[in-house]
């Protein structure tokens, strides 16, 4: 199995994702420069950062990078794509996931640990977690206030596409636990087919105890388990 | 050469934390009469060509594709020769 971490101008969590996959999990991992449109991997990671300086809107310009044409094809063919933070924003702009990001309700850039509740463990990204499991994972963003039309939200909930919600340490979804004003406390969603995940928190920053926690591991472990089962590739 | 002006605004009802912060700051300065602030973008494009109608259509396409995110924003386009 081979992971590809896309590098946009302004990505800054690319090396962290690469490190976790390559050194912590010992999996073949390559960088994919945003101008490349010819690569062969089993899972694409769109890392966090500030692609193209987030000029115009977060993710808006990256969405038209040459690499994204291939990412869309890969996703449409069933390939696994995980977008973290800025990667999530890019997936929204690209239309691979529904909705959009607004600035944080508090207007502050929020950079601290949050708690997430796993709402759906029947996905390639969460199968190693149990439903209702509470994960402690850091966030770092100024535009993570997820928004979508009421009809879209209904569909997301009905289809089990809301994968992670912000909660408190006891797993209760409360307004106080919501760091950015996200609709329905949404921290991560999946597409209808279930092969594209976007999440604001950074699992790559908490996959080793030396960094203060290992709760992010479950996401990488789930992806690896899914690929090991030889599930379809894009 | 034509000048196209694109105004991008958040749709009504979509929360604008930036506008709220500016409103609070204006109140702190004593401008209590300000009841609402909405922040948008104003983008000026210099566009080659003479057919203003065609330019307007093209710029609307640009706004729809890139300059605005129509999930949360609306836009207006003005073109002058």
Curated annotation (Swiss-Prot), chain A:
Pathway assigned in UniProt: Purine metabolism; IMP biosynthesis via de novo pathway; 5-amino-1-(5-phospho-D-ribosyl)imidazole from N(2)-formyl-N(1)-(5-phospho-D-ribosyl)glycinamide: step 1/2
Enzyme Commission numbers on file: 6.3.5.3, 3.5.1.2
Location in the cell: Cytoplasm
Subcellular location, principal: cytoplasm
GO terms for MF: ATP binding; glutaminase activity; phosphoribosylformylglycinamidine synthase activity
Protein keywords: ATP-binding, Cytoplasm, Glutamine amidotransferase, Hydrolase, Ligase, Nucleotide-binding, Purine biosynthesis
GO annotation (BP), single: 'de novo' IMP biosynthetic process
Catalytic activity of the protein: N(2)-formyl-N(1)-(5-phospho-beta-D-ribosyl)glycinamide + L-glutamine + ATP + H2O = 2-formamido-N(1)-(5-O-phospho-beta-D-ribosyl)acetamidine + L-glutamate + ADP + phosphate + H(+); L-glutamine + H2O = L-glutamate + NH4(+)
Keyword match Thylakoid: no
SUPFAM superfamilies: Class I glutamine amidotransferase-like (SSF52317)
Cellular-component GO terms for this entry: cytoplasm
Active site (UniProt): 85, 202, 204
Subunit structure: Part of the FGAM synthase complex composed of 1 PurL, 1 PurQ and 2 PurS subunits.
Function recorded in the entry: Part of the phosphoribosylformylglycinamidine synthase complex involved in the purines biosynthetic pathway. Catalyzes the ATP-dependent conversion of formylglycinamide ribonucleotide (FGAR) and glutamine to yield formylglycinamidine ribonucleotide (FGAM) and glutamate. The FGAM synthase complex is composed of three subunits. PurQ produces an ammonia molecule by converting glutamine to glutamate. PurL transfers the ammonia molecule to FGAR to form FGAM in an ATP-dependent manner.
Name of the protein in its database record: Phosphoribosylformylglycinamidine synthase subunit PurQ
Organism for this UniProt entry: Carboxydothermus hydrogenoformans (strain ATCC BAA-161 / DSM 6008 / Z-2901)
Gene: purQ
């Amino acid at each position: 199995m081979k992971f590809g971490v896309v590098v946009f101008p302004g990505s800054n969590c690319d090396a962290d994702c690469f490190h976790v996959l390559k050194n912590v999990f010992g999996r073949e991992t390559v960088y994919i420069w945003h101008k490349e449109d010819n690569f062969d991997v089993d899972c694409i990671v769109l890392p966090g950062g500030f692609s193209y300086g987030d000029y115009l809107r977060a993710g808006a310009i990256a969405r038209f990078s040459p690499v994204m044409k291939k990412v869309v094809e890969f996703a449409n063919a069933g390939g696994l794509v995980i977008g973290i933070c800025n990667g999530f924003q890019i997936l929204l702009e690209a239309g691979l996931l529904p909705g959009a990001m607004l600035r944080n309700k508090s207007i502050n850039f929020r950079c601290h640990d949050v708690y997430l509740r796993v709402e759906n463990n029947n996905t390639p990204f969460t199968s190693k977690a149990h439903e209702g499991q509470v994960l402690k994972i850091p966030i770092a963003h100024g535009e993570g206030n997820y928004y979508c039309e009421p009809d879209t939200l209904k569909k997301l909930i009905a289809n089990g596409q809301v994968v992670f919600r912000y909660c408190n340490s006891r797993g209760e979804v409360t307004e106080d636990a919501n760091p950015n004003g996200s609709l329905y406390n949404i921290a991560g969603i999946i597409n209808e087919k279930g092969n594209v995940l976007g999440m604001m928190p950074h699992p790559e920053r908490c996959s080793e105890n030396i960094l203060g926690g290992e709760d992010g591991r479950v996401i990488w472990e789930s992806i690896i388990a899914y690929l090991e089962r030889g599930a379809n590739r894009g | 050469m034509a000048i196209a002006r694109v105004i991008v605004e958040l749709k009504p009802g979509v929360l604008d934390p930036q506008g709220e912060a500016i409103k609070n700051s204006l109140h702190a300065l004593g401008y209590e009469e300000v009841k609402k602030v909405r922040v948008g973008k104003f983008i000026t494009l210099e566009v080659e060509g003479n057919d203003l109608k065609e330019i307007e259509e093209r710029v609307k396409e640009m706004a729809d594709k890139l300059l605005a995110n129509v999930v949360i924003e609306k836009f207006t386009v003005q073109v002058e020769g």
